[in-house]
Design a protein with these regions (language model features):
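Structural signature of alpha-solenoid helical repeat scaffolds
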Residues: 4, 43-44, 89, 129, ...
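"A position-specific structural signal for the A-helix of alpha-solenoid helical repeats
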Residues: 15, 19, 49-50, 54, ...
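TPR/TPR-like (Sel1-like) alpha-helical repeat modules
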Residues: 21, 73-76, 119, 146, ...
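TPR/Sel1-like alpha-solenoid repeat signature
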Residues: 52, 59, 71, 98-105, ...
Length: 185
């Protein structure tokens, strides 16, 4: 939120809104989505990526994964686009719609479709750059495979993540979760 005190730029607002939405705080992320929609009605990334991602995350928080998937339909033609905002190979927004669509599809128990969304992220590493969704897609892909009953592919996805994060601090929550989930396989 401190970033919003310094700037009301489109990308700063989206980054703050995304952090809030991923933290399941739609009471604060949705006013940001409203503001982006109001101030940037013709902006391609605001209209077709940023706002739909924030709205879909809110739908997920509300337990409405199908609504989340529907809200992201508008983003499909733009999901491989790059905003032009690059922080040392961190492209803000690139494939966020695919990641959130994958989460929504998992919640809707559409596991094969969810796996395809997470695989899309892994297949386009150049767009994702060092965005955390690049690593997290491995975990989510593993989860999709577990839920669809394919333990062999799940093990591979989890191992890919654990290899990427082999030097990470050992108490990071997603890492401990991934290790525990992998151990159950």
């Amino acid at each position: 939120m401190a970033a919003l005190d310094l700037s009301k730029g489109r990308d700063v607002e989206y980054a703050a809104g995304l952090a809030l939405a991923l933290s399941r705080d739609s009471s604060r992320s949705q006013p940001i989505a409203d503001d982006l929609e109001k101030r940037f009605p013709e902006d391609t990334f605001a209209k077709f990526t940023y706002v739909p991602v924030l709205r879909a995350l809110s739908a997920l928080e509300d337990g409405k994964p199908t609504d989340g998937v529907e809200r992201l339909q508008i983003a499909l033609p733009y999901q491989l686009a790059v905003t032009g905002l690059n922080f040392n190979h961190f492209y803000l927004g690139g494939l966020h719609s695919a990641y959130v669509r994958g989460e929504a599809l998992l919640a809707a128990r559409r596991y094969a479709e969810a796996a395809a969304e997470f695989q899309k992220i892994l297949d386009h590493r150049g767009i994702v750059g060092s965005d955390p969704i690049g690593a997290l897609a491995h975990v989510q892909l593993g989860r999709a495979f577990v839920l669809s009953g394919d333990k062999i592919k799940a093990k591979t996805a989890y191992m890919d993540f654990l290899t990427l994060w082999k030097d990470a601090d050992p108490d990071i929550p997603i890492l401990t979760q991934a290790r525990a989930e992998y151990a159950k396989l």
